């Protein structure tokens, strides 16, 4: 299959072909058909690969430079070198036609569609703005201003750094997922159980769209979701009553060796409390310790809700930098939970904990409980211009009815999950006042928008 290079404008509704499918521009031909277009490229142009903007940390005297804290990618400025073969006086028409494609202030951006020769798949870049400059064609005696029939055109564009495909790829399709870390189904599903995560960001995180139907039992007001490297579940079953502060039974050793070699991972502790009395007067926290009991991190106190049956608790996260050292032994931690009373006697049983080594974690606040047939959507990818699926500038969340008509918005707090090779999707949901039903299930669909820096990995 031959090379295809197109400008697709939501503003004009026109598709202009910048490369002739026969390999030779047709003088005076229609630019709206691949076989008759008078446009061509002057050189072996290919989209420039995005260079990352780095957010660094550390450094200073005697340090080996700085550590990488975050990656982002800026817009790209580049020039597409075009030529136009027309008939007498047509150069002005070609220039105006190109300029009209970018009248996008009150429309979605013009799309640059690229399909390399021999590839079956094309990708779409969003062009934010463009400058069209005509120039004299080599070997001619007439400039564009003098009505030259053939001209060079420099198409100077500012575009987004990534290109997307015309369709999302489904990683998880209407799968039943649980609300606890054990049993079948449990609360995590591998992204690559049936489909490989693709694209140039598969190890950096590429956008996901998540759809969760209302669970079979609960009516969630908040949903926790994450992209995780691993999850460790441990039953604790420790009951405590106190008017001051006391500790639950500690977990056994949990392997966190991956923190040494995967700098972006963080550790998070979540858990479930049952059989509560006066929970509104209680707070809990978790301490991360070495396998021998030395304190590594003390997470903040968490206020409990009012539900007395069972509550889901997000104890918080830590980077555990103290363990990122070059030792060969397995690196393990134990988790010690505590409960304290703010007033009077309080009782709770720490049923279990889960320790997540995670890439991304967020809490989606639904503003009101999900009702029958409603769905929660967390959207990291968009195709508003009608072409490829590209990242949202910021992930959006909303509640819809069963036909996906919007009902109300929701709020994403934290970093919405992204797709990583080898990672899994993890979830937990709660009703009002922190109420948690471990046996609850829901249908989950997760779709993925592969992103491409250039055409080198497009097939």
Predicted segments — roles?
Residues 21-35, 40-41, 218, 225-362, ...:
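Polar, enzyme-active/binding microenvironments
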Residues 1-229, 281, 325-328, 358-459:
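Extracellular/virion structural assembly segments
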């Amino acid at each position: 299959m031959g090379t295809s290079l197109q400008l697709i404008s939501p503003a004009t509704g026109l598709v202009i072909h910048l490369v002739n499918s026969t390999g030779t521009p047709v003088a005076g031909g229609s630019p709206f058909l691949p076989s008759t277009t008078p446009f061509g490229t002057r050189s072996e142009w290919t989209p420039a690969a995005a260079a990352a903007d780095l957010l660094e940390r550390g450094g200073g005297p005697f340090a080996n430079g700085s550590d990488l804290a975050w990656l982002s990618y800026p817009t790209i400025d580049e020039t597409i070198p075009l030529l136009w073969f027309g008939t007498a006086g047509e150069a002005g028409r070609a220039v105006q036609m190109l300029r009209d494609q970018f009248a996008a202030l009150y429309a979605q951006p013009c799309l640059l569609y690229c399909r390399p020769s021999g590839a079956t798949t094309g990708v779409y870049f969003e062009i934010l703005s463009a400058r069209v400059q005509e120039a004299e064609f080599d070997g001619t005696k007439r400039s564009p201003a003098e009505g030259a029939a053939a001209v060079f055109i420099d198409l100077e564009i500012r575009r987004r750094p990534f290109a997307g495909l015309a369709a999302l790829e489904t990683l998880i399709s209407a799968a039943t997922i649980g609300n606890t870390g054990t049993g079948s189904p449990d609360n995590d599903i591998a992204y690559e159980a049936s489909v490989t995560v693709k694209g140039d960001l598969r190890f950096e995180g590429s956008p996901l769209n998540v759809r969760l139907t209302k669970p079979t039992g609960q009516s969630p007001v908040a949903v926790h979701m994450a992209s995780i490297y691993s999850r460790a579940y441990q039953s604790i079953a420790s009951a405590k009553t106190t008017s001051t502060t006391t500790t639950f039974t500690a977990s056994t050793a949990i392997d966190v060796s991956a923190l040494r070699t995967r700098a972006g991972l963080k550790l998070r502790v979540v858990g479930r409390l049952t059989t509560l009395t006066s929970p509104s007067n209680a707070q809990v926290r978790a301490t991360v310790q070495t396998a021998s009991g030395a304190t590594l991190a003390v997470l903040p106190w968490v206020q409990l809700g009012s539900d007395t049956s069972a509550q889901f608790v997000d104890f918080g996260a830590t980077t555990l930098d103290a363990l990122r050292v070059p030792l060969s032994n397995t690196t393990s931690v134990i988790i010690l939970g505590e409960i304290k009373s703010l007033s009077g006697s309080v009782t709770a049983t720490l049923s279990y904990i889960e320790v997540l080594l995670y890439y991304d974690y967020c809490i989606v606040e639904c503003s009101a409980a999900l009702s029958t047939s409603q769905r929660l959507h967390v959207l990291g990818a968009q195709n508003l211009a009608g072409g490829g699926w590209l990242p949202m500038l910021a992930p959006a969340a909303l509640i819809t009815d069963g036909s996906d008509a919007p009902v109300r918005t929701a709020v994403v707090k934290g970093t919405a999950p992204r797709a990583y090779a080898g990672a899994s999707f993890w979830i937990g949901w709660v009703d009002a006042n922190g109420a948690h039903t471990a046996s609850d299930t829901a249908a989950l669909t997760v779709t993925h928008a592969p992103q491409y820096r250039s055409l080198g990995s497009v097939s």
